Amino acid sequence: MNIIKKSLITIALCGAALCSYAADVKPYVEADALPDALNYYPAPPDTMSPQFMYDISQYMWGKTMRKDSARAALAVAQAAETVEEMAAMFSEPFGMEISAKKTPAIMNLLERGVLTLRKVGSKAKRHYMRRRPYDRFNEPTLVPAEEERLRTNGSYPSGHTARAWAMALLLVEVNPAAQDALLKYAYEWGQSRVIAGFHWQSDVDASKVLVSGAYPSLHTNETFMADMRKAQAEFKKLKAAAKPAATKAGKK
């Protein structure tokens, strides 16, 4: 089964289970201790700039990509926001099922880590309140149910991309051997926001820089480092246990 089909099945199952953040999840680092995007990252492109022309061209590209039914379906699936949904979808590039039941230490790391890093763009979102492409052009998106809610939520930077990029970086540290697959999947998650019509390309690009810039701040937190060691140990244990099972299955 390919990654697109698995993503669609995953989001359906998570939706049925009413996936949500645990109410008691706390960030490792408070938002005001993270790098301030307003102090170091540029404002969104001016509407008369060459950079904005590129944003428009990418929006047009995104609409052509909707003709690919499989890619469009992936863009819809990647409109997921909860850590539970996202972790299940990242399981394939990670190489192991990620869930509260199967990998509690890894899930704890993701819940707290993503909650921390996704806030890195919140201040910029409120400050710029950039208009989203579908709203600017008065055109439909791939997820109509989200249009009204997001119309009053700033476009720059992309929150979905921030969550996906944060999850990829956390999982890469747990399983470095899967780094290429994880980063590729997170990259496509960002592009899905362009394809779906919710974000400009510069929104997506900004999120990856902001999250990458904030990630080192996690390493100053002792609780994060302890949780990372637990997640790494859990992964190694499960991976080691899976090898004998795979060997036995191959001999049958």
What are these regions (language model features)?
Residues 151-154, 195, 199, 210, ...:
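Short alpha-helix boundary/capping motifs
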Residues 24-196, 220, 227, 251:
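Hydrophobic alpha-helical bundle signature of multipass membrane enzymes
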Residues 12-20:
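Hydrophobic h-region of N-terminal signal peptides that target proteins for export
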Residues 2-8:
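Bacterial N-terminal signal peptides that target proteins for export
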Residues 188-219:
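Interfacial helix-loop-helix junctions of multi-pass membrane proteins
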Residues 18-19, 173, 216:
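Residues in and immediately flanking transmembrane alpha helices
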Residues 129-135, 163-164, 204-212, 232-235:
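Short alpha-helical linear motifs
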Residues 221-252:
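Acidic, carboxylate-rich catalytic segments that either coordinate divalent cations
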